[in-house]
Amino acid sequence: MTRRNGSAPASGSASGAGCHGPLCDLTGPLVVALLAPDERAVEAVFASAASRGADLALLARDLVSPALDEVGQMWHRGEVTVAEEHLATAVVHRAFTRCASHVPPPPLGAPRLLLSCLAGEFHELGARLVGEVARGAGWQAEMLGANTPRDAVLGYIAQRRPDAVGLSCALTGHLVECGKTVAEIRRLAPGVKVLVGGSVFRRDGDTCGLTGADACFSDAVALRDWLVANRPAPDGCGEPCAPGPEALRKKVGGSRRTRA
């Protein structure tokens, strides 16, 4: 593929400060595969990481995150286009999801984690990867997606009563909204754990205490460890639990009668 200046990733740049542990040598090949784009090559890189013992959380922190950081830096240097950057994000998401499909699903009655990006937040890949990590840690994960209004998040919490809520915040300008959302969740559902994460907390750890959350995470490994350590018993969903199939059938039936 031709770059604007004909360059490959800068030498050593993909294995810099954002790279951790034994997967650093795979970051460069992953960047090349993402920008090709070559999904088979991406999956081959993931398979190589898995052969070294990397689980989904390590894959996200030590490989995907530094690779996408490098793609972003290449965009800032004028070496790739916005379209190429967006395509790289889509490719890595598809490949990561396929990789996660080999992990056994959480057991019946597993605790539930609700994930959502704040209103105005359009960077949703991190939260989607975290959802796969959570499932691998034995939690059911439900993702509301990007730019979800606060009222919609609160309404879903009232309906589903998850065991924990994870809010994704990438931009410093959204920290106030993050704090307000955390406070509203506390008032609505005092027993629900509220977690926050995103690149803004990776850039400045001091912002964590400003949100009022139960825990703050700058990477998927720390979140995985928290989820494993704080996993409720399978039958401890609390009251009221999420609506069962019968309640959902009645809701759908009522909706159909209303339209008729």
Where are the model-predicted features located?
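Peripheral docking tails and interdomain loops at the edges
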Residues: 200-260
